[in-house]
Amino acid sequence: EMLMDDDSLSENQLGELMKTHQTLEYITKLNKSLLLLTKIDNGQFTDTKDLELNTLLKQYLEDYKEVYDYRNIEVNITEQDRFHIVMNESLAVALLTNLLKNAFVHNMDGGRIQIIITKNSITFRNSGSGHPLDEEHIFERFYQGSKKEGSTGLGLAIADSICRLQ
């Protein structure tokens, strides 16, 4: 990043530096996702506690508010009940943030996200981006229904792995 501030760089050199920086960010994100999946597969998240996912979801939804507002995406939460679960808090956060990101990334500008919380489930629905996901493959690692820049194709695989632990 400091190199990009160098005024002596040509436009071409700056462009190459920016590409390299984006590639490094992608590789870092991919590495973190694969490490998380490996830890989940190896059962390394043993510390659990009673969590109320309604509050946790709203807390992380607030973090995404500006991003959703930027694309004019309306988010509605219907709370039919409180969702209590005993699980690892880090995994709960990873699950919810992956689902929130996915609902945003695979949505259209001016779209909607509907989140329905019951005693035993949380359902995410969005208006979509015009490209339906293949139901047989959406939880496969590296599957991407439509290639999104910076996407690793691991978000729903992580969410699926976390849910299978419960």
Name every feature range the model reports, one short phrase each.
Residues 52-64:
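Short beta-to-alpha transition helix within the HATPase_c
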Residues 110-121:
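Short beta-strand/loop element within the Bergerat-fold HATPase_c
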Residues 49, 74-84:
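Conserved catalytic submotifs in the C-terminal HATPase_c
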Residues 163-164:
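Detector for a conserved hydrophobic position within an alpha-helical segment of the HATPase_c
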Residues 42-47, 84-88:
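Conserved micro-motifs of the catalytic ATP-binding
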Residues 20-27:
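Short alpha-helical segment of the dimerization/phosphotransfer core of two-component systems
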Residues 103-104:
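Short helix-loop "hinge" at the ATP-lid/N-box region of the Bergerat-fold HATPase_c
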Residues 131-142:
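Short conserved segment of the HATPase_c
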